Amino acid sequence: MPAGTGGSENYTVGHVRELNRRGEPAQVVTVGLGIEDGRNEFTDVPFHSLPALADVAELDGTVVFVNEPHDVATRQPAFLILHNPPPIRERHRAFAVEGTRDRALIVTSRYAARLWSDYLDVDIATVSIVYPFAEPCFATHVRAANDTGRTRVLFAGRLSPEKGVYTLLETLHIDIIEQDPELTFTATTAGVDKPQGRIIERLLIEHPAISVVATRKSAESMAGLMTTHDIVVMPSNSQYWHETFGIVSIEAQHSGCRVVASDDGGLPETDCGGVILIAPDNAEALAWGIRAAVDSGPLPAAVREAAGMRFTVEQSVDALLSVFTRPLPVSPRTIVRQLEELILAPSTVESDSRLRLQGVGGSPDSMP
């Protein structure tokens, strides 16, 4: 679970940290990684590594699976937090469906609740929502004065196709962007731990219109990066991927940045007053979205302050604890089992009919 690689890692670690701060013992459990599971990058968070997935069955307390719906028995009813959209390949469907049949489901937005309830064919009321959050430092980090005379644009997402990096590359060549010397663009190396990320990194390094800086592996360092930029772009793909939320948008607004984001998935739910929504997968739309953000000027301090009071870690953990304490919905597996038992149970009508045919309990004329 390397730091600086994605929102689900920050979400998980942030929850565990806040739970322990409140005196609620919690830990991050990894499988098959030993001590090389990322714990060295989160020294204030307890980690526990298991040799094999089956060992999860021996854990005490509440077990929360993150993203991967492994069908493993647990001592108590378990939860599953789904940060990603459902898989689009049919070969992955059985794993997703089977692994969620006996779990209490948690998602990160209203959009994700609708998406997963449709995919799994379950009542949307049985899917709980626990919104992500920005760490407090994003709202409190001081913004330095911009003495460059330029508008600084940051792509803070992972270097992966679904985050819209190729749309951004197209946008760099559109006239209203390319011909403006007062625009600067920066991306980080988040995601270069994957092969596709390393390929995209090389493309960006070769491009004269964008700078590449090292990924930030802590909330504090990312807040420092965002507060030296004016606009954060999130041109996420909508063809084969849908952002279920978009925590970078929250972090950016808490940091005092405007956000230009795809009007898709859960991204509209991240608007704290500083989001400009654009048509996804559309370089021209992204270009005009950036221009609109430039024309709007810096995000007002009052908007940043108000944004900083929304989507906090305290609010997120309050919601999580509420999910843990409320009665659990009946799982799909339990419903199927009950239906099977009902089908296999002797019918009352059939039993009564047999009795009547044997001359017990009324005449044949009284049968329905």
Residues covered by each model-derived region:
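A charged, aromatic-enriched C-terminal amphipathic alpha-helix characteristic of glycosyltransferases
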Residues: 7, 49, 138-140, 295-350
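A conserved mid-protein helix/loop that constitutes part of the nucleotide-sugar donor-binding site
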Residues: 10-14, 151, 160-174
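Glycosyltransferase donor-sugar binding loop
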Residues: 32-34, 183-198
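Short beta-strand->alpha-helix junction loop in the catalytic core
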Residues: 111-112, 129-140, 190-192, 307
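Nucleotide-activated donor-binding/catalytic signature segment of Leloir-type glycosyltransferases, i.e.
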Residues: 197-220
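Conserved acidic donor-binding segment of nucleotide-sugar-dependent glycosyltransferases
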Residues: 275-283, 290-297
